[in-house]
Amino acid sequence: MNQVLLEMRGITKTFPGVKALDNVQLTLKKGRVMALMGENGAGKSTLMKVLFGIYQRDCGTIRYQGEQVNYSGAKEALEAGVSMIHQELSPILHRSIAENIWLGREPLKGPLRLIDHAKMYRDTTELLKKLDLHLDPRTPMSELTVATMQMIEISKAISYNSKIIIMDEPTSALTGKEVDHLFEIIEKLKKQGVSIVYISHKMDEIFRICDDITVFRDGCYIGEREAQNTNHDELVQMMVGRDLGDVFPPPTAKPGKVRLEVKNLSVEGVFDNISFKLHEGEILGIAGLVGAGRTELIETLFGVRKHDVGEIWINGENVEIKTPQDAISHKMAFLTEDRRQSGLYLMLDIFANTSIAHLDAYRNKVVNVLDVRSMQKDCASQCTKLKVKTPGMAEKIDNLSGGNQQKVLLARWMLTKPDILFLDEPTRGIDIGAKSEIYKLMRLLTGMGKSLVMISSELPEVIGMSDRILVMHGGKLKGELDGKDASQQQVMSMAFN
């Protein structure tokens, strides 16, 4: 199908002091999935909000189904068949599935115009069946997983007879199986002639589900490609204006002596008989599928989990690590997989988030008072070194981009002066430009003699950044590869066997 459903041409949108969109364009064809790619701040979400009527454009034209349109708000866009599923879902948790879908549009009956609950539940059941969802429409949203809530949002879009559905980072909180189910739904929608705008940073998903790709950079339209006629490297170059080789900086240090040695480490039912060495100035990548035991291994080394058998040696000494405090005392640091859930204090400012793991070092033992001035100085210095972009240390951390939030977490741990850093999915949810900055920081750390263990589900990242790569499958270590010689095929072959 090549029928053009939506054309946006010459769209410009200016906010005070910032041109968010500068003469951009987008073409969406019927029954196809268009990826909209670009770094954070490239203008992707702004353009979608212009289409959805949340923002009014300064100039440009929007043609939908051959007619020029200008929606004054979300309600008008929805009624015209344009739906948007936001990254941060906002269901009414104490209301039922049916109530969330039909809110403000409930079927009415009788002269008193009362809500016809029986019809609403029947209609909801029919909607859910279209997505292979066998749920009781009376179920409160609070009892659903994030993935199921997302399916309810898609059901809601279908209830409007949507011809265009915008999905903003739809898989950010989904497991592998949940992603598979979402993609099955998208394929069904395509067959029904529905068009999808798919905003994501995840290259593997883009090439798996999208037909066409449009790239923005700094509020400008860079180009459009058919997914089958482009590749990862070209898209990175389009998004950041430089080649992939520049994204992964070369090693700055030659690995030195053994700093960490793990011998026959096991946790029953989780991973078994894991042994490896980590050297000074080295990045050791750990690859594997979801459920391979990678995160659990790092949690055990950091004292979050207790191991059943095995030994941990640091600088030639057999050590006992039973708690994270033990790990920190042995100069270890751990950037967790989900920074928003288990790393950041979102209601606090940058200063509090940076200093919180190292308060005792600034405590006057005699009068039990914190030296706040020294804390502020050191926190600001560390954030400056790591190039955290912020108006000041008093800025709420929730206002920062994902890349800058990750830098603040890194600054927090650098105050503890670690020698070994465990990085679990260090660039998850951040754009290509911010990833490049994180990679440079990782190389800076190895240049200082720090030892890094990196877990990543992105194979180009594992191969581009690792000196050596360990591959896990089903809780077992399947092999080791030299980073500079490894291929994605080799890694995946080990990960699946």
Swiss-Prot record:
Reaction equations catalysed: D-galactose(out) + ATP + H2O = D-galactose(in) + ADP + phosphate + H(+); methyl beta-D-galactoside(out) + ATP + H2O = methyl beta-D-galactoside(in) + ADP + phosphate + H(+)
Entries under PANTHER family matching the protein: CARBOHYDRATE TRANSPORT ATP-BINDING PROTEIN MG119-RELATED, GALACTOSE_METHYL GALACTOSIDE IMPORT ATP-BINDING PROTEIN MGLA
Protein's cellular compartments: Cell inner membrane
UniProt keyword Translocase present: yes
Any one Pfam family match given in the protein's UniProt record, by short name: ABC_tran
Gene: mglA1
Record InterPro entries: AAA+_ATPase (IPR003593), ABC_carbohydrate_import_ATPase (IPR050107), ABC_transporter-like_ATP-bd (IPR003439), ABC_transporter-like_CS (IPR017871), P-loop_NTPase (IPR027417)
Main function: Part of the ABC transporter complex MglABC involved in galactose/methyl galactoside import. Responsible for energy coupling to the transport system.
Keywords: ATP-binding, Cell inner membrane, Cell membrane, Membrane, Nucleotide-binding, Repeat, Sugar transport, Translocase, Transport
UniProt EC number: 7.5.2.11
MF term (GO), any: ATP hydrolysis activity
Family note: Belongs to the ABC transporter superfamily. Galactose/methyl galactoside importer (TC 3.A.1.2.3) family.
Membrane topology, as annotated: Peripheral membrane protein
Recorded GO CC terms: plasma membrane
Domain annotation ABC transporter: ranges: 6-243, 256-494
UniProt entry tagged with the keyword Nucleotide-binding: yes
Binding site for ATP: 38-45
Subunit structure: The complex is composed of one ATP-binding protein (MglA), two transmembrane proteins (MglC) and a solute-binding protein (MglB).
Full protein name: Galactose/methyl galactoside import ATP-binding protein MglA 1
